[in-house]
């Protein structure tokens, strides 16, 4: 028998290119399983094979626990120490028992367990082999094409999957085609796909530029951000760590060779290379190219920017189906509102008039004083109530007592408005989890509550169309808030 075990280990190890120790472990598990089937009760068995001789011993064992719930597999600490005083909780008490002989049933059981363990070992090796390549471009040959995905043969018994959403639109592959993509996920699953590859995520664009532009690999040029409408258009932001080098020109290449190579790999995707700037407003101006920006107004509190362009440039600035401004927004991380110069001016005039009306109504001041506050950049009661006092004292003609009185009136007004809101809502008040969601201020929370959206769970069940006409809430922001709520409520992400 010992020679048979050693022969099996050697044969399987060579055939599957697996370490001998993995095969020994699989055999031990198989023999333990076969032994358990000889007993009517459920027991715990351990088999130990001598790695040199092939001989094996079998042990029945009991886990040392505080309270026994499975008498055939567990033993109390007191009883265990009766035999061995050195034992502790979590240790095992073992008795050697008769080892199984290899009859037909035992052989079949052992074979099934070995096959399963070998398969698990092969899958573990694939995970170990590719985990260090996560985030890199890999190449495979199309093995099978399904409706929802394609399978890639990567060699060495490794397969990857490209899901339909990770392909470019109108991209079709046939068995035998060579395909490149970024390995974005390595999952140690017991069944199904383990390696997931994408061609549509921004990481694919970044890695292709890393291959085509040596300066990126040398860290002379740095890719700061990327945004894609896969297969159609993309924007990538670059900066240089060496002022002698033009990062945009280096990425474009001689006669556009470098950017063209990337574009060709991505099905002719048009790529805008944008110069990174640490100033968010200037970076957004760069990202809006090829459109020329006439002026830009930044609202840091709401993390939005109003972008004004000449009327003749409006269509170009927005792009087909909003593509240009959407990509610029994704690239910069800011919510961008594009309009004509006249529209921006009219918007700011309307906002100024609204702020003046609010100040005169709630602060008991005249229109001239309210106008001065607006011209100095104050537009809400919250700003007047909570900005540092020194900012208000910088306004000509205001002294400390006046500022104190103004701040006190603003705080009282906010309290009055909040109380009125709560009374008007009745029982429909925003819950703490909604108020604490990033991106939801108190005003928006009460607007949502007025629609019956009072909790994160309520928000998670909404669609963008359900929130479309809430003042100050864009479709993009509504979608982001809904997804954030779903991630927390449905998938257990932290707020």
Curated annotation (Swiss-Prot):
A molecular function (GO) term: DNA-binding transcription factor activity
Location of the KH domain: 230-293, 302-368
Effect of gene knockout: Mutants are sensitive to DNA-damaging agents.
Any one annotated GO CC term: transcription elongation factor complex
GO BP term, pick one: transcription antitermination
Sequence segments annotated as region (2 X 51 AA approximate repeats): 364-489
Sequence repeats: 364-414, 439-489
Result for mutant: residue 181 to D: In nusa11; inability to terminate transcription normally at termination sites
Stretches assigned to the S1 motif domain: 135-200
Classification via InterPro entries: DNA_repair_Rad51/TF_NusA_a-hlx (IPR010995), KH_dom-like_a/b (IPR015946), KH_dom_NusA-like (IPR025249), KH_sf_prok-type (IPR009019), NA-bd_OB-fold (IPR012340), NusA_bac (IPR030842), NusA_N_sf (IPR036555), S1_domain (IPR003029)
Keywords (A to Z) from UniProt: Cytoplasm, Host-virus interaction, Repeat, Ribosome biogenesis, RNA-binding, Stress response, Transcription, Transcription antitermination, Transcription regulation, Transcription termination
Region entry Acidic repeat 1 (AR1), spans: 345-426
Induction summary: In response to low temperature. Negatively autoregulated. Induced by cold shock (42 to 15 degrees Celsius) (at protein level).
Compartment annotation: Cytoplasm
Keyword hit for Transmembrane helix: no
Principal location: cytoplasm
Role according to the record: Part of the processive rRNA transcription and antitermination complex (rrnTAC). The complex forms an RNA-chaperone ring around the RNA exit tunnel of RNA polymerase (RNAP). It supports rapid transcription and antitermination of rRNA operons, cotranscriptional rRNA folding, and annealing of distal rRNA regions to allow correct ribosome biogenesis. Participates in both transcription termination and antitermination. Involved in a variety of cellular termination and antitermination processes, such as Rho-dependent transcriptional termination and intrinsic termination.
Subunit organization: Monomer. Binds directly to the core enzyme of the DNA-dependent RNA polymerase (RNAP). Interacts with nascent RNA. Interacts with the termination Rho factor. Interacts with the phage lambda N protein. Interacts with SuhB via the AR2 domain, crystallizes as a 2:1 SuhB:NusA heterotrimer. The rRNA transcription and antitermination complex (rrnTAC) consists of RNAP, NusA, NusB, NusE (rpsJ), NusG, SubB, ribosomal protein S4, DNA and precursor rRNA; S4 is more flexible than other subunits. NusG and the alpha-CTD of RNAP interact with the AR2 domain. (Microbial infection) Interacts (via N-terminus and AR2 domain) with Escherichia phage lambda antitermination protein Q; this interaction (AR2 domain) releases the autoinhibition of NusA.
Family: Belongs to the NusA family.
Protein name: Transcription termination/antitermination protein NusA
């Amino acid at each position: 028998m010992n020679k048979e075990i050693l022969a099996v280990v050697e044969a399987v190890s060579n055939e599957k290119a697996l370490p001998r120790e993995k095969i020994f472990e699989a055999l031990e598990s198989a023999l333990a399983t076969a032994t358990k089937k000889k007993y009517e009760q459920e027991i715990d068995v351990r088999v130990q094979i001598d790695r040199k001789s092939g001989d094996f011993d079998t042990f029945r064992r009991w886990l040392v626990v505080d309270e026994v719930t499975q008498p055939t597999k567990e033993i109390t600490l007191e009883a265990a120490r009766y035999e061995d005083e050195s034992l502790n909780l979590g240790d095992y008490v073992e008795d050697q028992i008769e080892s199984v002989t290899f009859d037909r049933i035992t052989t079949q059981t052992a074979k099934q367990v070995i096959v399963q363990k070998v398969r698990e070992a092969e899958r573990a090796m694939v995970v170990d082999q590719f985990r260090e390549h996560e985030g890199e471009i890999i190449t495979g040959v199309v093995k099978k094409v399904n409706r929802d995905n394609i399978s890639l043969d990567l060699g060495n018994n490794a397969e990857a999957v490209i899901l339909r959403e990770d392909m470019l639109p109108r991209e079709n592959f046939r068995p035998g085609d060579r395909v490149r993509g970024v390995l974005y996920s390595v999952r140690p699953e017991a069944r199904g796909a383990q390696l997931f590859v994408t061609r549509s995520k921004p990481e694919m664009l970044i890695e292709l530029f890393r291959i085509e532009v040596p300066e990126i690999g040398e860290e002379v040029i740095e890719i700061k951000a990327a945004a894609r409408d896969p297969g159609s258009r993309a924007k990538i932001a670059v900066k240089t760590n060496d002022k002698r080098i033009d990062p945009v020109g280096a990425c474009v290449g001689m006669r556009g060779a470098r950017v063209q190579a990337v574009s060709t790999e991505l099905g002719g995707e048009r790529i805008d290379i944008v110069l990174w700037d640490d100033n968010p407003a200037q970076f957004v101006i760069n990202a809006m190219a090829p459109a020329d920006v006439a002026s830009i107004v930044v609202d840091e509190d709401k993390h939005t920017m109003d972008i004004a362009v000449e009327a003749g440039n409006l269509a170009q600035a927005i792009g087909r189906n909003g593509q240009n401004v959407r990509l610029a927004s994704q690239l910069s991380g800011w919510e961008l509102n594009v309009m004509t110069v006249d529209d921006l001016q009219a918007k700011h005039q309307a906002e100024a008039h609204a702020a003046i009306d609010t100040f005169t109504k709630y602060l008991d001041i005249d229109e001239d004083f309210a106008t001065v506050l607006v011209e100095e950049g104050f537009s809400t009661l919250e700003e007047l109530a909570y900005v540092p006092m020194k900012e208000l004292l910088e306004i000509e003609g205001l002294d400390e007592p006046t500022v104190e009185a103004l701040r006190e009136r603003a705080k009282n007004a906010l309290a009055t408005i909040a109380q009125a809101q709560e009374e008007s809502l009745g029982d429909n008040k925003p819950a703490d989890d909604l108020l604490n969601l990033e991106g939801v201020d108190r005003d928006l929370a009460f607007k949502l509550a007025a629609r019956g959206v009072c909790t994160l769970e309520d928000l998670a069940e909404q669609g963008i169309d359900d929130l479309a006409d809430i003042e100050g809430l864009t479709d993009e922001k509504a979608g982001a808030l809904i997804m954030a709520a779903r991630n927390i409520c449905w998938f257990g992400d932290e707020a």
